Amino acid sequence: MSVLSPARLTHLQRLEAESIHILREVAAECENPVMLYSIGKDSAVMLHLAAKAFYPSRPPFPLLHVDTTWKFRAMYELRDKVASDLGFDLLVHKNPEAEARGINPFDHGSALHTDLWKTEGLKQALAKYGFDAAFGGARRDEEKSRAKERVFSFRTTEQRWDPKDQRPELWKLYNTRKHPGESLRVFPISNWTELDVWQYIHLENIPIVPLYFAAERPVVARDGSLIMVDDDRFRLRPGEVPQMKSVRFRTLGCYPLTGAVESTAATLPQVIQEMLLTTTSERQGRVIDHDQSASMEKKKQEGYF
């Protein structure tokens, strides 16, 4: 079997090799790792990389989906099938406090909804199962606070991120040593761009949620975003009437807090062509990123992904 030398690897092959190295490093050095699964395109790439990294064995860690109960229906439909097909054990956690209080983005706003369902839900799940390392699909090109976060991001005993108290990462040398009670958030695709992700999905034929492709969907224009009416829980404001538009999503989250973009890109080559021409970040469609100045960094300091 021939092996490509590093000098002959393509750009995507180099990224793939780096990500697989990170996955194996954590599996070897940490006692109880887990892979966070948000059902989005970045998670799909991470699952595929993990399956490759440990083939023909099953990946030596489970998947964890922190469920808010407000994801798009198409995301839930894909979740169980993909995890089963790739041989992962899937754990689903819902914050019992948020569930009991009926926390939702309409009555309680995006900030409280995100804090209880996502941040507190994640911290509960990590503590419940005793995970000491969690893989996440964040990338540096997404948002400024993620741009300065290390690949191996250390969290305190309270699961908080202190950007001023992180380990240096020299070349490809990663330090996994933790103080008692500390944990790691690890980002294997930190150095990938949105375009890299799409090209890799196309090259490897990775299954993704159909919402990433343009189709006629019912949306309302709200606060500068096109919000899809995904089920009968959606509350229309006075004067709002859903309109059918050709839209797709560049990022996926809770559907009342995720804006679509008008598009006709219905295939992977068309999406890639669109990415070559775009000048905006994919996270412009996330309502939670616009709560307040530097809100993503504050969320991460409180324990967010």
Swiss-Prot record:
It comes from the Bacteria. Keywords: ATP-binding, Nucleotide-binding, Nucleotidyltransferase, Transferase. The keyword Coiled coil does not apply. Residues 283-305 are annotated as: Disordered. The keyword Nucleotide-binding applies. InterPro entries: PAPS_reduct_dom, Rossmann-like_a/b/a_fold, SO4_adenylTrfase_ssu, Sulfate_adenylyltrnsfr_sub2. Pathway: Sulfur metabolism; hydrogen sulfide biosynthesis; sulfite from sulfate: step 1/3. Its EC number is 2.7.7.4. SUPFAM superfamilies: Adenine nucleotide alpha hydrolases-like. It holds the Pfam family PAPS_reduct. With CysN forms the ATP sulfurylase (ATPS) that catalyzes the adenylation of sulfate producing adenosine 5'-phosphosulfate (APS) and diphosphate, the first enzymatic step in sulfur assimilation pathway. APS synthesis involves the formation of a high-energy phosphoric-sulfuric acid anhydride bond driven by GTP hydrolysis by CysN coupled to ATP hydrolysis by CysD. Heterodimer composed of CysD, the smaller subunit, and CysN. This is Sulfate adenylyltransferase subunit 2. It comes from Caulobacter sp. (strain K31). The gene is cysD.
